[in-house]
């Protein structure tokens, strides 16, 4: 016979408030000043009289520091702050630009334009040069091309990984300054 599923008790997020604070004394701060160390029941009564909540600010201190404030406003402010932090967060991606050692000048300019756009967006760029057939005998052309890319982007980007040969391709990683 199957046992019924019993979910874990929900974990409460945020600071403890009012009756959840289970210590004999607290360091109390109200809107104006620090009221010092007082018994928890007196602190709860003062918060109730003010029509606000007793919120634990620093639970690890001895005695815990509590403040009389509106818990709803505190939670709202914390949510706003977290949303703002998420909005500002940018995940750095590595974009790849593929070239050949004998790339034409216009094609090179188009690739450089794309590379500059990636740097403006704050992304890293991995420049990959693919050698085919007998092109492997002329690796100096590939190195020369990667050095040209490095020189053309030195104002807006820095080299994160120097050009190196891996199998039939040469690669270099650039990061925005």
UniProtKB/Swiss-Prot annotation:
SUPFAM superfamilies: Translation initiation factor IF3, C-terminal domain, Translation initiation factor IF3, N-terminal domain. One of its GO terms (biological process) is ribosome disassembly. IF-3 binds to the 30S ribosomal subunit and shifts the equilibrium between 70S ribosomes and their 50S and 30S subunits in favor of the free subunits, thus enhancing the availability of 30S subunits on which protein synthesis initiation begins. It comes from Rhizobium meliloti (strain 1021) (Ensifer meliloti). GO terms for cellular component: cytosol; membrane. Its main location: cytoplasm. The keyword Cytoplasm applies. Monomer. Keywords: Cytoplasm, Initiation factor, Protein biosynthesis. The gene is infC. InterPro entries: T_IF-3_C_sf, T_IF-3_N_sf, Translation_initiation_fac_3, Translation_initiation_fac_3_C, Translation_initiation_fac_3_N. HAMAP family: IF_3. This is Translation initiation factor IF-3. Belongs to the IF-3 family. GO terms for molecular function: ribosome binding; translation initiation factor activity. It is found in: Cytoplasm.
């Amino acid at each position: 016979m199957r046992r019924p599923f019993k979910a874990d008790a929900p974990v409460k997020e945020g600071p403890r408030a009012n009756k959840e604070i289970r210590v004999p004394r607290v360091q109390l701060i109200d809107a104006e000043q620090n009221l010092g160390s007082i018994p928890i029941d007196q602190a709860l009564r003062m918060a109730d009289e003010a029509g606000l909540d007793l919120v634990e600010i620093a639970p690890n201190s001895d005695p815990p520091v509590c403040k009389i404030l509106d818990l709803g406003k505190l939670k709202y402010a914390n949510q706003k702050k977290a949303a703002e932090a998420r909005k500002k967060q940018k995940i750095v991606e590595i974009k790849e630009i593929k070239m050949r050692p004998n790339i034409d000048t216009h094609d090179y300019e188009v690739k450089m334009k794309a590379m500059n756009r990636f740097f403006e967006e704050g992304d890293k760029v991995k420049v990959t040069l693919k050698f085919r057939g007998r092109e492997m005998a002329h690796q100096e052309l590939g190195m020369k091309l990667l050095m040209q890319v490095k020189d053309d982007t030195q104002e807006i980007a820095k080299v994160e990984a120097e050009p190196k040969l891996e199998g039939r391709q040469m690669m270099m990683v650039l990061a925005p300054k």
